Amino acid sequence: MFGPVRVTAATPIGGYAEPRPALIAVAHGSRDPRSAATMSAVVADIAAARPDIDVRLAFLDLNAPSVEQVVNAVAAQGHTHAVVAPLLLGSAYHARVDLPGLLAAARAAHPQLVLTQAGVLGPDPRLITTLRDRTLAALAPAVWPRHGETVGVVVAAVGAASAAANAQTSEVARRLAAMTGWLTEVCFATTEPSVTQAISHLRTRAAEEVLVAPWFLAPGLLTDRLVAAAPDVVHAQVIGPDTALTEIVWDRYDTALTGALSLSA
């Protein structure tokens, strides 16, 4: 099990008496230990960027500590306000239903603790730049940039029941294509189009060098499934710990906090 990543707040900022509102970074969770280890590293970077704030990692499912456990700990520490930032790339069931339900129960258990849910990471341009960089690192040097127009990239995501959530992945692929000139297609690990279908579409579009770019924060069973389904193409690394990811999480924190202050004014 992975314990909480936390930093004790010490400095009043923006008119707040000590402590500054905590940040609870909520990851999905996975049966694959690589996923929890990666998210622990991600949140360690987030905490290091602003050591004046109490930062903790929680998981929606399958790993500990749970959201309930972390909220209990934050309340016991004496916090009266925490921002809950979903470490989720899409705004689907977990962000819209699962996490809000958990927070509603937590508010009932701790009426003295204000819990403000921040926005998801989403298709932020900074993350798409990181996706490009991960893909470039996997691309043979002789291919890019001289033959960039013949590169085909499958942007691979989890997949959701929500068409709007899946459309966000298509938007990521469009932005990546605009940024690089690469041919792009999308695939999903849990629904269609599959990775093999997406590769076939790229071949039809005359892509000569095909890679899979996982739109995932961490490796796990689903990224392994993608590799197993398409073992003959190069798979780039997941996003993982990254300066851009850290910046985006703190932007979501600040935006959520500003909104909460406006509502209470």
Where in this protein do the model-derived segments appear?
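Active-site-proximal alpha-helix that buttresses catalytic centers in soluble enzyme cores
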Residues: 1-265
